[in-house]
C-alpha cells in the first residue's frame, strides 16, 4: 500500500496536468481535417442541401476553427455544437476567406445568419440569442441556395438537443 499511494498520486497528477494544458489561442497554421458527418438543411421552400461538416469538439479545435484555411468547398463546413445553449460569439481572426455563419437554435431551426463575414476581422459576430450550434459555410452559399432563418438543420450531432 505504501508504494501504491505514491504511484496513484503521481498518475493522478500526470492526468490532471494533461487536462490543464492551455488553449493555444494564437495558432500559426490550419488544424488537420477533423472528423466529419453529414448535415442536411431543409428550406421552408422545400429545397434540401447536403453538406459534409467537420466537428470540432475540444476547446482547442473550437478555438482554431477554420483559421488559415484558404478555401471552404461549397458542400462542406464546420459545425460547432455547444454543450448547452449559449449566445454564440465568433470572429474571423486568421480566416482569409469570407464565411456564412448559421446560428442554430432549439430543434435545429436556423435563428440567425451572418452572411459573407469579413476575412481577418476581429469584430464579434454574435447570434444575439442562445443557440445550440453554429455552422460555418462558404461565404455567400446561404444567399445562393436561398437558406434562411426558419429553415431546418438536421445532423446527428444535433440529435437530442
For each feature predicted by the language model, list its residue ranges.
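Sec-dependent signal peptide recognition
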Residues: 2-9
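N-terminal signal peptide c-region/cleavage motif recognized by signal peptidases
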Residues: 15-17
Amino acid at each position: 500500500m505504501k508504494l501504491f499511494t505514491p504511484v496513484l498520486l503521481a498518475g493522478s497528477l500526470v492526468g490532471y496536468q494533461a487536462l490543464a494544458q492551455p488553449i493555444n489561442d494564437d495558432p500559426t497554421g490550419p488544424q488537420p481535417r477533423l472528423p466529419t458527418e453529414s448535415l442536411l438543411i431543409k428550406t421552408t421552400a422545400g429545397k434540401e442541401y447536403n453538406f459534409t461538416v467537420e466537428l470540432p469538439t475540444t476547446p482547442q479545435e473550437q478555438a482554431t476553427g477554420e483559421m488559415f484555411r484558404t478555401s471552404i468547398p461549397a458542400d462542406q463546413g464546420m459545425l460547432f455544437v455547444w454543450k448547452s445553449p449559449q449566445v454564440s460569439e465568433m470572429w474571423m481572426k486568421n480566416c482569409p476567406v469570407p464565411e456564412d455563419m448559421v446560428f442554430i437554435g432549439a430543434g435545429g431551426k436556423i435563428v440567425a445568419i451572418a452572411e459573407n463575414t469579413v476575412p481577418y476581422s476581429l469584430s464579434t459576430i454574435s447570434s444575439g440569442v442562445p443557440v445550440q450550434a453554429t455552422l460555418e459555410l462558404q461565404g455567400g452559399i446561404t444567399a445562393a441556395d436561398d437558406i434562411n432563418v426558419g429553415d431546418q438543420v438536421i445532423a446527428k450531432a444535433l440529435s437530442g438537443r
